[in-house]
């Protein structure tokens, strides 16, 4: 039972409601709400914490965001967590982006949530005009069968998975570098961190999370621009993916404290439309009038590229405009050492078991759309993928490989854990698969 839907509830209200419901409910419904803050979720009346998350259609995937949302709520409030709603774009159905029903965003979201320790899979909102219309119900079977396979083991005291950096086979013995894609994970809120150290193995070390909304000083309670500590192996670029600009933004990049790039958005002159509303011309894809706020949103969905010299630098990304814009990702290139593959390893473990979801980051809904449009090549498998699970008790373990699309076991083998390290050598990774590891 949820006391509210996307309402920022106050602590006294929820405490009072919880006591009343407990006294009259003979069935013992679990109690929650959306949205809640620290005071709300720490109430004993709240059986589990919950939130909703939607993108704006310009993000490439949802995995990192969903994993971070789960980890934040589970670690902070120490009670079960459910992502009660999620989707590609808060303004429209997933059908708009996935008319053929490949279900990649949804698929990745439910597996990322389950294997992050969620009390259930993340819940998609668009049942009628997406799931039912395209008859996507069969995607539930593989995850349901996997839950059944694990059985009562779900009731163990799980903790986040610890593992070494994954490595994979490379075509050349020479060191090669590719894209490092940084993805903001928060929605409409003040960032919890502002400093991000980017390691060439693909890891991010930070003091918190930043928002997809790059707020300007016009919202002082939300304004906290990010800075990145980088070490470029050679001269390269930082490419800022701008989604939507609200009214107007001025993006600024500073390298080691010196401004090196500035871009006003929209870029053009003022004009009036047929209704006399003032707007600006620019290189945006489209403009949308938001009647509620009497303002224009300008949809760009494009990269703005800033050169970065070789070596160690501190890069600040700021917005000094009239209002916010969304930055859905920032690409640093060449930066990431290619011996470290672009994979997500999401999981939970005990001392004698582990549940792991392994995901090829190139398997996402945006890349799939580009393949359908003929502007991106076929998805290539990652070969020779291997990493070690850390913190298991020494001994022999059984490993089950699960096909997350067909809902079947595709391989079984055994491996020895020595000195708390269990080496996993995995088959070619095309899209994703799951692992169920148990001691013998």
Predicted features by range, described:
Residues 382, 416-421:
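Short, solvent-exposed loop/turn segments in extracellular or other extracytoplasmic domains
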Residues 78, 90-91, 108-239, 246, ...:
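Aromatic- and carboxylate-lined catalytic core of secreted/periplasmic carbohydrate-active enzymes
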Residues 299:
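Active-site-adjacent structural elements in folded domains
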Residues 2-134, 138-139, 380-381:
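Extracellular glycoside hydrolase catalytic/binding regions
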Residues 37, 72, 101, 105, ...:
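Generic detector of short alpha-helix boundary/capping microenvironments
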